[in-house]
Amino acid sequence: MKQFLDFLPLVVFFAFYKIYDIYAATAALIVATAIVLIYSWVRFRKVEKMALITFVLVVVFGGLTLFFHNDEFIKWKVTVIYALFAGALLVSQWVMKKPLIQRMLGKELSLPQPVWSKLNLAWAVFFILCGLANIYIAFWLPQNIWVNFKVFGLTALTLIFTLLSGVYIYRHLPQDDKS
């Protein structure tokens, strides 16, 4: 259910883009993200930090896109979110000395410290590369290609990287946790 809720604003954005244009899609994205946030609060009495940060960035960059009637702002949102995620992962590892991935999953999984560090660093690099790919595609290729990349490309890349992370984690689980 949570994954569906997280994906819903993206589907709404894509549908409105195909039916109308980038500005209608941006307005729909803002509304859909707000609805998902409100629903999460009403239904679960909890809103995750990442969802709240994403909402704020959607409102700021989406609002700027609509106010200035300039799609470059909404295109930057993707890279800014990925940069923030990568930054949080790197700061947690190098400054706070405990990888964010470990803080998030450490209660459910027992992994050696080097595995947590490598996994955390791998996700940081993944987010950096996705942010850079977004810059290239958003500003060097046609808008419709960027929309398809944002909706399908980044989603597929994230799913694949999540599966690869799962394989990496499984390989390093203690034998009794693998069953």
Swiss-Prot record:
Keyword Membrane: yes
Subcellular location: Cell inner membrane
Keyword Heme: no
Protein's membrane topology: Multi-pass membrane protein
InterPro entries: YciB
Gene Ontology cellular component list: plasma membrane
Transmembrane segments: 22-42, 50-70, 76-96, 121-141, 149-169
PANTHER family, sorted: INNER MEMBRANE-SPANNING PROTEIN YCIB, INTRACELLULAR SEPTATION PROTEIN A-RELATED
Function statement: Plays a role in cell envelope biogenesis, maintenance of cell envelope integrity and membrane homeostasis.
UniProt-recorded name of the protein: Inner membrane-spanning protein YciB
UniProt organism field: Escherichia fergusonii (strain ATCC 35469 / DSM 13698 / CCUG 18766 / IAM 14443 / JCM 21226 / LMG 7866 / NBRC 102419 / NCTC 12128 / CDC 0568-73)
Organism ancestry: Bacteria, Pseudomonadati, Pseudomonadota, Gammaproteobacteria, Enterobacterales
